[in-house]
A protein has these predicted regions:
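N-terminal alpha-helical membrane-insertion module
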Residues: 1-76
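Alpha-helix initiation/capping motif
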Residues: 10-17, 59, 105, 116, ...
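Extended aliphatic helical segments
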Residues: 19, 23-27, 40-50, 60, ...
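N-terminal topogenic membrane-targeting module
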Residues: 42-134
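Residues at beta-strand starts and edge strands
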Residues: 87-91, 119-121, 139-141, 217, ...
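An amphipathic, basic-hydrophobic helix/alpha-beta surface used to engage anionic
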Residues: 99-184
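Membrane-proximal, solvent-exposed terminal domains/tails of membrane-associated proteins
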Residues: 146-149, 153-328
């Protein structure tokens, strides 16, 4: 987990590779005695500037790509723009507090990344809260388990030659539900139609939000993974938005536990360009895809995963309202 926040986007491996492919030939041509060498230098500098320049936390090429994707989505079907690698399945359970108190056992839940010989692609906790002024004030919390076929192929083949990935995910979710019931939580496996959608089918995407059919604006945000993460999550839950969705996702990169977080805020008016809270990064031009990825059954891993130590995990908390208790 990073101790600092930065608005400068971090270039990925592909972007760095492209920059090096343009810059290295220019450097090797030094001192650029010929016209051709000077063209190589100019092209290298131009490519580096285009690929590394940014505005409001986004690379310029990312801004262009998202603008073009928005134009395409307005003239065709709306789909999740996130890439999926291979077959995967997700199962979710709804959880409410009872005798156990109001704070989820995050260490226990994260432990289901590797349990019963299966490796989960991600384990996520999602909470939805609505303001008391709404028609259905209250809160809901779900825990989702996502499994990919590739890393679990031997275990799946041992269970059945048909590779029952969805059934395996549901069995793992039931085992987690049983585990939570043993320590006093009320849980139940849920289907997709039992979880409300973040936006309606006819919602219209703009650069700063998605305009829902009711006229409300729903904006998605990445949550910075830094030393202030616990405080940021608390401020999201305490915000005065009409509706909030908050997600905390755990994964395992093979050497350590990682975490990512995101949220969505529904407001009556369009959000401005800046984030409403410190620690939030607006998903400018990518709100629809980000909102689809926030759904408890989406199966899409959140962006921005960073390493999380056991001590940092212990410092996080996730309160859950008891059944029938309003969120705020």
């Amino acid at each position: 987990m990073s101790p600092h926040r930065s608005t400068i986007p971090r270039p990925g491996p592909a972007r760095i590779t492209l920059v090096l492919l343009a810059v290295v030939p220019a450097v090797l041509a030094y001192p650029w005695p010929t016209t051709r060498d000077r063209w190589v230098l100019g092209v290298g500098v131009a490519v580096a500037l285009v690929l590394l320049s940014w505005w409001q936390g986004l690379h310029l090429t990312t801004i262009v790509r998202r603008r073009l994707a928005m134009l395409r989505s307005r003239s065709g079907a709306h789909t999740d723009r996130r890439a999926h690698s291979g077959a995967r399945a997700t199962a979710a359970l709804r959880i409410t507090a009872s005798a156990a108190g109001g704070t989820l056992p995050l260490s226990l839940i994260a432990g289901y990344l590797n349990r019963y010989g299966l490796r989960a692609d991600a384990v996520r906790i999602t909470s939805r809260g609505s303001s008391p002024e709404g028609d259905a004030a209250g809160s809901d919390t779900w825990i989702g388990l996502t499994y990919s076929a590739a890393p679990n192929l031997p275990a799946l083949q041992a269970r059945s030659p048909k590779i029952p990935l969805q059934r395996t995910a549901e069995i793992a979710a039931r085992r987690l539900a049983d585990h939570l019931r043993e320590i006093g939580w009320d849980t139940a496996l849920v289907a997709g139609d039992e979880i409300p959608a973040l936006i309606g089918a006819g919602a219209r995407e703009t650069w700063r939000s998605v305009v829902d059919g009711s006229g409300g604006h729903v904006a998605a945000y990445q949550v910075a993974i830094d030393a202030a993460l616990a405080d940021t999550l608390s401020r999201i839950r305490a915000s005065n938005a009409e509706e909030t969705w908050t997600t905390l996702e755990f994964a395992d990169d093979g050497s350590q536990l990682t975490v990512a977080a995101a949220c969505a805020l529904r407001t009556g008016s369009a959000p401005d360009g800046a984030a409403p809270l410190a620690g939030l990064v607006p998903e400018q031009g990518n709100h629809r895809a980000a909102l689809m990825g926030l759904h408890p059954l989406s199966g899409s891993r959140l962006d921005g995963h960073l390493g999380l130590s056991e001590g940092e995990l212990a410092g996080l908390s996730w309160p859950v309202a008891a059944a029938g208790v309003a969120a705020r």
